[in-house]
Each structure stands twice: as C-alpha cells, then as structure tokens.
Amino acid sequence: MARLKVKVWGEYACFSRPEFKVERVSYPVPTPSAARGLLEAIFWKPEFRYEVRRIGVLRLGTPFALLRNEVGNRMGAKPFFVEDARQQRTSLVLKDVAYLVEADMVLRPHATDPLPKYLEQFERRLKKGQYHHTPYLGTREFPAYFSPPDGEVPDGGLNLDLGPMLFDLAFVEDPGRPELTFKRPGRGEVQGYALPLFFHARIREGWLEVPAEKYQELYRLEEGHAKGA
C-alpha cells in the first residue's frame, strides 16, 4: 500500500448526518466515504481501492442555513416529472472549509500493474489539478478544490465527539435480495443490497482517525457474500 495526502477546500460543504430525516444537517468533517469519493474523483481505476486513514480539520467552517430545492422521490427504473416531486428544504451546511485527507492506495487481487504506477498517476493529477470527474464536498452542488499539502496543519486544540458517523456502504452480493444492481471489479454486474456501516467518530487534536478494522468488516461483507453466492 502507499500513503496519499491531499488538501481539499471549498466555499460550502454538507456531509449529512443520517439521524436528521427531513432537514439536512452537516457533520463538521467529511465522512470516510465522502473523503474516499474525493480521492476517486481525482483518480480512479478498478485495480485499486482507497482506505482513508485520517482527516484533519484545517478550517472548521461556519454553520450556515440554506434553503434548497430537492427532489422527494428516489430515482428508479420508471421516469417521473421532477416538478411534481420538488420540495424546498432547509439545510444546515458549512461555509468556508478546508481539510487534509490521508489515505492508503491498496491494490485489488486482480491488479496486474505495480502500485507505484498508479501512485505516480495520482500524484501527477494532484499537482496539475486534473480529475476523473468533478470532486465535491458532500453534495454535487458544492464543488471541491484540491492540491498537495502546503504545510498548513490542523488545529491541535480542536476536540469534538461527533457520535455515530457513516463509515461506508457495503454492497452485499445476494441474488435472494436483488434490491440493487452494481458492478464488481473484474467480474461485471451483480445483484444484492447496500448495508450502511457506522463507527463512533471523535476529533482529537484536529484529526478524525478512521478505524482500520472497519475496512476488514466491509471486505468481509462484500467478498464473503460473493464467495458464498
């Protein structure tokens, strides 16, 4: 594996807490899955995965109430008129944020090229500001900017207990529960369901540490069910 470090920032961010069902309320820091999404936006290949190790808070951001238009229906196989499902909801978002993301790039079993090849491609894109698709801070309307770390360090006096936080979604292959169709790297499309995984999040001395054992739980759910399918 290889360690990556990226600075990300933006004018607005919203990393939604799941316990607020109607209105969106943001965590003060990206969830591990949101941080992974930022890295995948910069560079992604099916031959490797990112494991986020920790997230540093450079600028905590100011809570800001924002009225947004959202669609109340989930996208399904059948089309629907957006205007019929549009809703106005208040979101408590963050204004003016910046973070450091540290993660490991880990090869998947079917990879044929060495890890340094992908690491060099990532670092090259990071320095040039290139990306696979537009990175965003929690929601697509809040674009993210990124660069190599510039020496700025997290606030060592910042300590927060954030409570339960979404770690990631485990896409469990299960033909007996075909709620979703998704792709498995190196195998194509399969059917199954998404299972959310949580952990108790704490910011200590400006850093949110991501428990490494959660990745093992994620892989057991995804790969274990695939082997038994």
UniProtKB/Swiss-Prot annotation:
Coiled coil: none annotated. Its EC number is 3.1.-.-. CDD domains: Cas5_I-C (cd09651). Pfam families: Cas_Cas5d. Keywords: Antiviral defense, Endonuclease, Hydrolase, Nuclease, Plasmid, RNA-binding. GO terms for biological process: defense response to virus; maintenance of CRISPR repeat elements. Does not require a metal cofactor. One of its GO terms (molecular function) is RNA binding. CRISPR (clustered regularly interspaced short palindromic repeat) is an adaptive immune system that provides protection against mobile genetic elements (viruses, transposable elements and conjugative plasmids). CRISPR clusters contain spacers, sequences complementary to antecedent mobile elements, and target invading nucleic acids. CRISPR clusters are transcribed and processed into CRISPR RNA (crRNA). Belongs to the CRISPR-associated protein Cas5 family. Subtype I-C/Dvulg subfamily. This is CRISPR pre-crRNA endoribonuclease Cas5d. The gene is cas5d.
